[in-house]
Amino acid sequence: LQHRTFCKLPAEPGPCKASIPAFYYNWAAKKCQLFHYGGCKGNANRFSTIEKCRHACVG
């Protein structure tokens, strides 16, 4: 399985101040982890559930 490049991006909460639980793929740790999304901007390495993260980046 070839990893999608967005799976290598760091967690990006963005500039807004909400605290929305989300998951990102931690490339160094090789697993999906929780972070808090601010609600705007950010990047493609953000998923609403750990299952979606695993499906996209773990395979």
Swiss-Prot record:
It is found in: Secreted. Keywords: Copper, Disulfide bond, Ion channel impairing toxin, Potassium channel impairing toxin, Protease inhibitor, Secreted, Serine protease inhibitor, Toxin, Voltage-gated potassium channel impairing toxin. Belongs to the venom Kunitz-type family. It holds the Pfam family Kunitz_BPTI. Disulfide bonds join 7-57, 16-40, 32-53. Signal peptide: none annotated. It comes from Dendroaspis polylepis polylepis (Black mamba). SMART domains: KU. Serine protease inhibitor that inhibits trypsin. May also inhibit voltage-gated potassium channels (Kv). Binds transition metal ions such as copper and cobalt. Expressed by the venom gland. Its main location: secreted. Residues 7-57 form the BPTI/Kunitz inhibitor domain. This is Kunitz-type serine protease inhibitor dendrotoxin E. GO terms for cellular component: extracellular region. It comes from the Eukaryota.
